[in-house]
């Protein structure tokens, strides 16, 4: 595998120097299983303003790399930026949710703003059940869910450091100081 990738890299360097742009693009598209070439193909599509190709390349990358969390999130972030550029709010909400479930808490406020009001509380509760701990904590703080904060502190008293300022002004203040 390593030798094959090295050979492909050498071939690409020769094409960059002596080949036509079309030959370079064809080479890149034949080697999309290599993340470096997928990144190049995505960048070429962005430069050409071809957002449907960006989306397709990112989705294919997610499918191929679903067992590799780092690459999976990289391709999800490509879709995130693609949907920002195209203004596709539903798809943007979906990819934000996928990033949240993958442990990226920074997408919470944007995701929440994209959810229709009548579905918001149900979707938040659903996400709380599936969220990794970093995202779970972010949601509790953002939504001021002192009931769940108190519950979390009872299970793991070290969480008190994170939640104490919210709990000290709540009905759970006495329980928080006892912990």
Please annotate each region the language model reported.
Residues 1-179:
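Eukaryote-biased, non-catalytic alpha-solenoid scaffold regions
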């Amino acid at each position: 595998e390593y030798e094959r990738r090295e050979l492909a890299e050498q071939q690409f360097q020769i094409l960059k120097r002596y080949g036509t742009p079309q030959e370079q693009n064809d080479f890149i598209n034949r080697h999309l299983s290599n993340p470096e070439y997928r990144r190049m193909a995505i960048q070429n599509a962005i430069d050409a303003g071809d957002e449907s190709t960006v989306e397709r390349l990112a989705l294919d990358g997610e499918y191929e790399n679903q067992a590799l969390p780092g690459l999976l999130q990289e391709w999800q972030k490509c879709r995130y930026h693609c949907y920002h550029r195209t203004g596709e709010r539903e798809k943007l909400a979906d990819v934000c949710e996928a990033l949240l479930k993958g442990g990226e808490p920074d997408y919470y406020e944007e995701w929440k703003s994209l959810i229709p009001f009548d579905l918001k509380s149900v979707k938040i509760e659903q996400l709380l059940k599936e969220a990794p701990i970093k995202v779970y904590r972010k949601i509790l703080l953002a939504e001021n869910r002192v009931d769940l904060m108190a519950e979390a502190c009872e299970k793991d008293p070290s969480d008190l450091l994170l939640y104490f300022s919210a709990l000290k002004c709540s009905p759970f203040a006495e329980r928080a100081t006892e912990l």
